[in-house]
Amino acid sequence: MARKVLASGLAESLLLLGRIEFFDLRLPDSADTTFVRALQAAGEADDNLLGAAILAHSAFVPGWAGHLDGARERMHAARTYARRAPVSADVLAWLDAVEAECLTRCGDHRGALALLRHAEDVLAADSDILPPDWFTWFSTTRLHAFRGNTELRAGLIPQARTTLEQTLSELPQTDGKQRIVVLGDLASVEAAARRPEQACALLEQALDQLAITWYATGMERVREARRALTPWQDTAAVRRVDDRLYSWSTTLSSLQR
């Protein structure tokens, strides 16, 4: 029993480390290795639900690299592990959201949106099963953030704006990392709508938050939005963003991490 408790604690710690490596630092290879170690510890603990969470996180690695088959295989494994344990609606919806993000990154926007609608239905249904204590990274608001990004990448600009503005209004001020991501996506929405000044205002808000809380995934979204502003790169608003995006501190943070 003591061995299982220790193994469970180790698996949770390694999962957190893998999340930091993948999302905060954008070190996918290191994260992939850490997720394997986390899965080994979850196996020692015989914790199927923790194993499902680790496998789903590991699906981000091939999914974000555009390798759909690898992501699907890992998601199938994650869902198989989840079926072996009592599972809450929150966890089931999150599994849908993870797979949807992988599909989005691989260009299957229709499939991703279908999964996100299913996740919303799952969350809306009653469930007596509570999520485990370590499951702290997902909520209805986070699901909306997933959907807004998919709508953006699918070219559904009005829908993406509505979804992301709602998400931003619901996010607590303390959730700085997610706010950076949503602000970056909203800036991309405004750039796609040919509203460069509004996009720049959102990017400046994102850069304000990045100065407080560095988040490599958030910086990626900021850079994506800035690339979308290339047609207006000689305007004063875009140059102000560039002056901040390529300040000494921001440039050094990007290179060091």
Where are these regions (language model features)?
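Conserved binding/catalytic microenvironments
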Residues: 1-257
